[in-house]
Amino acid sequence: MLGAMAEEAVAPVAVPTTQEQPTSQPAAAQVTTVTSPSVTATAAAATAAVASPQANGNAASPVAPASSTSRPAEELTCMWQGCSEKLPTPESLYEHVCERHVGRKSTNNLNLTCQWGSCRTTTVKRDHITSHIRVHVPLKPHKCDFCGKAFKRPQDLKKHVKTHADDSVLVRSPEPGSRNPDMMFGGNGKGYAAAHYFEPALNPVPSQGYAHGPPQYYQAHHAPQPSNPSYGNVYYALNTGPEPHQASYESKKRGYDALNEFFGDLKRRQFDPNSYAAVGQRLLSLQNLSLPVLTAAPLPEYQAMPAPVAVASGPYGGGPHPAPAYHLPPMSNVRTKNDLINIDQFLQQMQDTIYENDDNVAAAGVAQPGAHYIHNGISYRTTHSPPTQLPSAHATTQTTAGPIISNTSAHSPSSSTPALTPPSSAQSYTSGRSPISLPSAHRVSPPHESGSSMYPRLPSATDGMTSGYTAASSAAPPSTLGGIFDNDERRRYTGGTLQRARPASRAASESMDLSSDDKESGERTPKQISASLIDPALHSGSPGEDDVTRTAKAATEVAERSDVQSEWVEKVRLIEYLRNYIANRLERGEFSDDSEQEQDQEQEQDQEQEQDQEQGQDRVSRSPVSKADVDMEGVERDSLPRSPRTVPIKTDGESAEDSVMYPTLRGLDEDGDSKMPS
């Protein structure tokens, strides 16, 4: 039995050593001649030790040539003008270009013009040219922690990271197939720190919110944080549709970008803030958008996400999870304090343009013809925000300080009763017959009428008789009634006409009917009834073309006036919202320093240069040759005609030697001091 084991031990050793017959045969002979079991085992071990290096050598011998014959790394060629040096890595190529070709100011060899290939970009600083060289060199040292994408410059990575703010579907979930074993089996793991772009301070998850139970498939653990851990079960955000008081992220982003562009136009003065038409056209682009300034949140840049749902199977359940918030990038046009102050001044000009222009206010349907619009805290409101129903903040055009019509004097306190409308404007507002001069016009009616009367009390024709109305004015009441549809719209009354039905039109000349008055003639003659005697609502016949045209025109005017008024209100409210947004940012100190803005401007300048380089544009700064320089070429080689000198006029104080009648001529061999004798 021991002999069989020895043979089995020797047999596998003899297989790989078949190539070397002289060495293997004596060893096998020695093993077969020994009869002791211990000696046999010792010989088998020695044979295996001797054969193992040979086997390893035979196995490694074909691998060594393969490694020696592998292709070398691809070399990178420097494409700088006049240089063709090859370098092994992008890092070495970048260092070569920066040190050899760009140089430094301290070594007196600084070159600020890129000569890579056909690029001739010129910068003003060495940092700019070194950052520009990264465009040509395939060096991408800056990697994104979220997706692993590499970038050449840090500003490119910074802009790329902002795009991950859109990833609001998956909150903190691992990728498929990369599940953490510590989360599966409840070990003391190190925690799954998934990369995220969320503000940790805005989403504190209390530690007592988790009710841990017996470990099941998903073991709740804590991330390695000093305090207040915010990682619990693996949970996903379920998109249950838009919430009632919250718009979607896409609409918020569109409004955010539109508002940033609007602030940029204000800074660059691309429209006149003193023009009502220009202001209205520019504000129209911001309407019907979900602007961050219209929300009641303290920080408009933050928008909450749907509440996450924990994925766990066990008798325990997670506590209430506050919804994390994603952070929109800051507005590039309102970063510094000076930007906020300047934009607030521009908005103030726009607000004054809308309020203080009489024509614009009258076109909006707020002012009446013949009245002057006064904007102050008495007739309007303390703030610039108009209420739902615009008050009549108008004063008379007389030179003295006339009283201001109160809002309650033009509207009935009850919305279910007809409102009082002013009488015809045929009466002069400056006369004593104006309803403004009545003491009843200045009384403020209480919100609820006291008494057992079911209907509101209306002023009679005798009210205020002793305070300005004469006996002749008793025939006409000082006020008329209007429907509830005319709540806030000012009626336009024509002067000197009565509001009555239009009389029926008749021919200019009518001949006398001389026919016999018999039965047949009576049947042939149609009976004409005056249209003014028939109620239009009870008129059975079809209206005439003039009536239809006039009615349609009046309806169109009312609709247009209503649209203009609503647009004016929207503009006023929007400007106030924008001013409140700027004021809140100034109060909270939400602005950056000027140094950060300068750095961002340099980065934007580098990005523009990179885009120009990719498009193949030649940005060499060349001084333009003017037409005058072209015309002056070759003038030095040509002889110019000498202009004759002006003969000076001899005065009384001049001597004969000073005055010369002829111009001075100089010879070739004279020094120019001698003069011709006169």
From Swiss-Prot:
Where are zinc fingers of the kind C2H2-type found along the chain?
Answer: 76-101, 112-136, 142-164
- The region called Interacting region A is annotated at 169-301
- Compositionally biased spans, kind Polar residues: 379-401
Sorted alphabetically, which keywords does the UniProt record give? Activator, Cytoplasm, DNA-binding, Metal-binding, Nucleus, Repeat, Repressor, Transcription, Transcription regulation, Zinc, Zinc-finger
Q: Which GO terms describe its biological process?
A: positive regulation of transcription by RNA polymerase II
Q: Which SMART domains does the record match to this protein?
A: ZnF_C2H2
Post-translational modification remark? Activated by C-terminal proteolytic cleavage. At neutral to alkaline ambient pH, the signaling protease (probably palB) cleaves pacC within the conserved 24-residue signaling protease box, removing the C-terminal interacting region C and producing a 53 kDa 'open' conformation intermediate protein, which is committed to further processing. In an ambient pH-independent reaction, the processing protease (probably the proteasome) removes additional C-terminal residues to yield the 27 kDa functional form.
Q: Where is the composition biased (Acidic residues)?
A: 592-615
Q: Where is this region: Processing protease cleavage?
A: 252-254
The UniProt regions of compositional bias labelled Basic and acidic residues, in chain numbering, are: 516-526, 628-640
Q: What is the effect of changing L266F?
A: Prevents intramolecular interactions, resulting in the 'open' conformation protein committed to processing independent on ambient pH
* PROSITE patterns per the UniProt record, alphabetical: ZINC_FINGER_C2H2_1 (PS00028), ZINC_FINGER_C2H2_2 (PS50157)
User: Which stretch carries the motif YPX[LI] motif 2?
Assistant: 662-665
| Keyword Methyltransferase tagged | no
Q: Which family does it belong to?
A: Belongs to the pacC/RIM101 family.
Give the record's subunit note.
Binds to DNA. Interacts with palA, which binds to the two YPX[LI] motifs and is required for proteolytic processing.
The protein, known as: pH-response transcription factor pacC/RIM101
Gene name in the database record: pacC
